[in-house]
Amino acid sequence: MFNPNPKAFPLADRELTIQILDLIELAKAHNQLKKGANETVKTINKGYAELTIIAVDSDPIEIVLHLPLLCEDKNIPYVFINNKHALGHACGISRSVIACCIPAGVNPTLTDQVKNIRNKIEKFIN
């Protein structure tokens, strides 16, 4: 049984995780996705990130725990999901991915879905 690290908050439930992974696949299809911790950090620091997704099973977890702090500084919603391999698959990569983000100025076909996920994450936090 997987016991997530208590430092990883907010952790998406199964339904929200599926919706997030579907959104990531759509963003990848529209070339609107930044994959990996380094690209995610760069996008957050520039203020371009619309939404950040972090894998809770990153080993060690400390390599991604700075991302929530960066997101909070820039008022960017973030969420942890359970599986880095599923995140990598959704990003279109055969390897695991520990973090990704959807940059601002997304394709108009994704705007409503991004807003919907952002609202769910904000409700999840509060």
Located regions from the model:
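Polybasic, low-complexity intrinsically disordered tails and interdomain linkers
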Residues: M1-Y48, A104-N126
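Short, functional N-terminal and low-complexity linear motifs
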Residues: N5-L11, A55, F80-A86
